[in-house]
Design a protein with these regions (language model features):
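N-terminal subdomain of nucleotide-sugar transferases
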Residues: 1-70, 399-403
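Conserved donor-binding/catalytic core segment of Leloir-type glycosyltransferases
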Residues: 11, 210-228, 234-237, 250
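Carbohydrate-associated surface elements
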Residues: 179, 200
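Nucleotide-activated donor-binding/catalytic signature segment of Leloir-type glycosyltransferases, i.e.
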Residues: 264-286
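Short alpha-helical donor nucleotide-sugar binding micro-motif in glycosyltransferases
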Residues: 285, 293-298
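Conserved acidic donor-binding segment of nucleotide-sugar-dependent glycosyltransferases
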Residues: 285, 338, 342-349, 358-364
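Aromatic "clamp/platform" in nucleotide-sugar-dependent glycosyltransferases that forms part
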Residues: 306
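Short hydrophobic beta-strand element within catalytic cores of glycosyltransferases
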Residues: 323-326
Length: 403
């Protein structure tokens, strides 16, 4: 174990982290860092696209506004400029393009005050780069996994080969749910130790509080992309309104990636086609406190996804004491119970509409205090920090003993 009173020094590497240019991107990573910073020194490296002066495309030029360094609370954050890393245009090459600049910064920071552990988020490009930094600087590496490895790594063999080569330099892979653990384990085939380290629910923001709820308001929070099946939810709303004509839907969604622009246009077209303009409000780019307040004021939160690795929205909704109507989409099935809402099959408009009506019918039977206490006890900041620090201590201590 580390000496009594000495805080671990953790280097976090994540391409996904909130910035002024993309304030909703990587909120889950920021929450993990904020929670860990209660008991460890957290330094975050966020590889950031280098953009030349006077670049004409605003969607890319916005990255020039990101500072080189800043401190948020207890966390230090560096934004080293790297070639590429603009959405998915250079995806297959992003690890190789970024390594030189990120390694140089990590080497300098390590020389000033040595790190005990590198914690990367996503195996690629983050984990691949972290593996090479760890081997160069003799620091153990772990990754948190927030996305499915298959079919992704099989469909992109250039990425898959880089991941395979990096595994020897990674001590632990930590998917965010048992559901994702199964997917990643099938690819790893026992080549690296694994454990589950879930996402954090920020219980200082997402908590139950007395509010006058709107019994006719449904809430969806998340990206508008095909995997989220927002189209199924919109069609289900149209079906619900046949018997409940005052029912409305609020969609709170950040325009995080230009790649999903066509998906957003299709959703807007569907709303117009079904004549639901007055029943659906789409709000872009709300911050977490605004999302939490919307959760506290709505009747139900709806999760319509085909697949979810964890589903922070489901956990946050329950932390706010708001029941769910949710598809059987994997990750949240580990913590959502019949006492928390209604589960239905994926890609079934009629089933989703029926689930909404069923949950509305027993809305007063749900116990908000019980929902909140169960979620916070498992995923709140203190609970998460207990899990993370035990993992950090174990990896750092074992590595020191072997070296």
């Amino acid at each position: 174990m580390r000496p009594v009173g000495r805080r671990l020094r953790i280097l976090v590497l994540s391409w996904n982290y909130p910035t002024g240019a993309a304030p909703q991107r990587g909120l889950w990573v920021q929450r993990m860092c904020d929670a860990a910073a209660q008991r460890a020194d957290i330094i975050v490296l966020v590889p950031t696209p280098w953009v030349p002066p006077l670049f004409p495309l605003k969607a890319v030029a916005r990255f020039r506004t990101i500072p080189q360094w800043e401190r948020r609370g207890r966390t230090e954050i560096y934004f080293p400029r790297v070639p590429g890393s603009i959405e998915y245009f250079t995806h297959d090459f992003d690890a190789r393009l970024a390594l030189r600049n990120v390694l140089a910064l990590a080497r300098r920071l390590h020389a000033e005050n040595s790190f005990d552990l590198i914690h990367a988020h996503f195996i690629y490009p983050d984990g691949v780069v972290a593996s090479q930094i760890g081997q160069a600087l003799n620091i153990p590496v772990m990754t948190s996994e927030h996305a499915f490895w298959t079919p992704w790594l099989n469909d992109r063999p250039r990425v898959g080969s880089q991941v395979d080569a990096a595994l020897n330099g990674i001590k632990l892979v930590a998917p965010v749910s048992p559901f994702l653990h199964q997917n990643v384990a099938a690819y790893l085939r026992d080549r690296v130790e694994m454990t589950v380290l879930p996402n954090v629910v920020d219980d200082s923001v997402f908590f139950a509080a007395p509010r006058e709820r709107d019994p006719n308001q449904l809430l969806y929070v998340g990206l508008i992309r095909r995997l989220k099946r927002v189209d199924v939810l919109i069609r289900a709303l149209a079906e619900v309104r046949r018997t409940h004509p005052t029912m409305r839907l609020k969609i709170m969604s950040a325009n995080a990636f230009r790649a999903y622009g066509q998906d957003r246009r299709e959703v807007h077209d569907l709303v117009r086609t079904l004549g639901l303009e007055s029943a659906i409000e789409i709000v872009a780019g709300s911050d977490p406190p605004a999302v939490a307040e919307a959760m506290r004021q709505c009747a139900l939160v709806v999760v319509s996804s085909a697949r979810e690795t964890f589903c922070s929205v489901a956990a946050e909704s329950l932390a706010c004491g708001t029941p769910l109507v949710m598809t059987r989409c994997g990750g949240p099935e580990d913590f959502v119970t019949p006492a928390d809402g209604v589960m239905v099959d994926v890609d079934n408009v009629h089933a989703l509409a029926g689930g909404i009506l069923e949950a509305l019918g027993k809305r007063d039977d749900f116990d908000a205090a019980d929902q909140q206490s169960r979620i916070v006890a498992r995923f709140g900041r203190e609970a998460w920090c207990d899990q993370a620090m035990a993992i950090y201590d174990r990896i750092a201590t074992a590595y020191r003993c072997r070296n």
